[in-house]
Curated annotation (Swiss-Prot):
Source species taxonomy: Eukaryota, Viridiplantae, Streptophyta, Embryophyta, Tracheophyta
Functional summary from the UniProt entry: Involved in cell size determination. May serve as a chaperone for expansins through the secretory pathway.
Native species: Arabidopsis thaliana (Mouse-ear cress)
PANTHER family (alphabetical): POLYGALACTURONASE 1 BETA-LIKE PROTEIN 1-RELATED, POLYGALACTURONASE 1 BETA-LIKE PROTEIN 2
UniProt subcellular location: Secreted, Extracellular space, Apoplast; Secreted, Cell wall
Signal peptide: 1-23
Tissue: Expressed in flowers and stems. Detected in trichomes, guard cells, root vascular tissue, root hairs, pollen sacs, sepals and styles of pistils.
Stated name of the protein: Polygalacturonase 1 beta-like protein 3
InterPro entries (UniProt xref): BURP_dom, PG-associated_BURP
Domain remark from Swiss-Prot or TrEMBL: The BURP domain located at the C-terminus has not been identified in non-plant proteins. It is critical for PGL3's role in cell growth.
FXXY repeat windows: 117-120, 125-128, 139-142, 153-156, 167-170, 181-184, 195-198, 209-212, 223-226, 238-241, 252-255, 266-269, 280-283, 294-297, 308-311, 322-325, 336-339, 350-353, 364-367, 373-376, 383-386
Amino acid sequence: MLKQFLLLQSFSFFLFNVVIVGGRTFGGGFSAEENPFTPKASLVRYWNKEIRGQSPRSEFLISKASPLNAVDSATFSKLAAANSLPTRFPDFCSAANLFCFPDLGASLEKHDDDVKFSVYDQKNFTNYGNARAGGADSFKNYSKDGNVVTDSFRRYSRNAAGHDDKFTVYGENSNVVEEGFNSYGTFGTGGAGDFTNYQNNVNNPTSRFTAYSDGGNGRSQTFKTYTHEANAGNGQSFTSYGKNGNGVPNEFTSYGVSSNVIGSGFSNYGESGNAANDTFTSYGSDGNVPQNNFNNYGASGNAAVDTFANYRDKANVGDDSFSSYAKDSNSEKVNFVNYGQSFNPGSETFTGYGKGAEGSKLSFKTYTPNSTFKDYAKKGVAFAKYNVSTTTANTVGDGKTVNKWIEPGKFFRESSLKEGTVIPMPDIKDKMPKRSFLPRSIITKLPFSTSKLGEIKRIFHAVENSTMGGIITDAVTECERPPSVGETKRCVGSAEDMIDFATSVLGRSVVLRTTENVAGSKEKVVIGKVNGINGGKLTKAVSCHQSLYPYLLYYCHSVPKVRVYEADLLELNSKKKINHGIAICHMDTSSWGPSHGAFLALGSKPGRIEVCHWIFENDMNWAIAD
């Protein structure tokens, strides 16, 4: 009896202790926040086990742990083991705080009157505006300032006559945007489609125009200020755009201007069309590495006129491919004026351009000096000021060439890290969707290799040729890229994996640091107190940078010969502390490419200078504890 009493007393004492630690109780004496079986609690224990006691625990890293509760974590782990996660994908995405596109179902909504959509978001338009006579629909401030934006327009304005569509400030200032236009304006007569300020200032924009204005008669499309100042997306794909059209004018003005790594693909564009009139003005100008592909563009067309003016002008590098352009066409006129005069030389490839054409006139004026012509029409081509190299770069007082695409302050010299120095601060704000790590119990059951891309896409509901499919492919491919000279790298999707990688390189006595906030971004700041990590000596370090992926994924790597600093950042006029930044200086740049942005900005060559940069918001730096 006494023994049973003592056992009961011990058990009661155990429960009491758990309640005291947990605070509010639920289901057995644990709180929702402190349940020891949650992924977050597991991560805390893992940190305490793997990192030596004198190293401060990083609440920053702990905050990125999976928000799944104990029950959901166990449930989704079992589903992952059984390859059944897709059956609960919406629930999994929401509960685990993942980055996912919504599954848009078909909509049969119709309308007979003019419609104005203002401050609208996330909609599927199917069979919308079909066979309408006259009228106009206006999309203004649509999907603006969103995070993950997905819109679908299918069979919109099909067989309509004189029907106008206006997309103004559409998808602006959003992050990861995907819009699909299928069979839009097909067989329409007259009317106009106007895209103005479309997907401007967007991170990772994607638009797909399939069978857009196919078989249209006199229906014009205008794209103005389209993907202006956008960043790193697949861009736009135009498939069978204006195919079999009659007198269809299309105008692209300020398209992709000042954008970063944006691509466009034109496939079967204007094919078999009659009297098409396409104008590309200031297309891809001032951009960074724009890539555009024209495949089977204007093939078998009749009396078409295409004009490329100030195309990819003052851009940095960039590549264009023209395959079977104006092939087998009749009386086609193509004018390239001031084409491809990029800041740094890009390349153009013309394969089968104008081949088999009759009575066509192709004119090149002030064209790029770096082009390849294969199976090119020999007759009817005029080259004026061809292969003339123009200097469009800006120069500063010391004669160094400065590329406008290298943001001031993105790269700097070690000598700038001195108290009192005024330095431009780049935009260090994290522009990726907010996500969390997955717990190790789930991530170890998910595929992650290029050989299993199909399975990965199935899990995350990424259909073929979708934006999400491209995001997944890009991330996995980059993670499998062989390391550069002297680099040790690993992609991690759980905090435990990051801890393992950092400690494998640096040992178990480590400190995790990140820049405190984003104050001072895109402004001039004053360097305050500076502290060199590990005495400011050459040291080892591990830097982890976010990769875009459904769950929180970091590309972690260690390179030799670096110095790491932490510095107070002061407001320019008041000298008040506004931030505490972490900077890393690469002392050996000999293996870097000569076209690296650091050398364009600082005016040097690989191996001749050290290069420093800040650790951006939500990126991390691991160093050996002092």
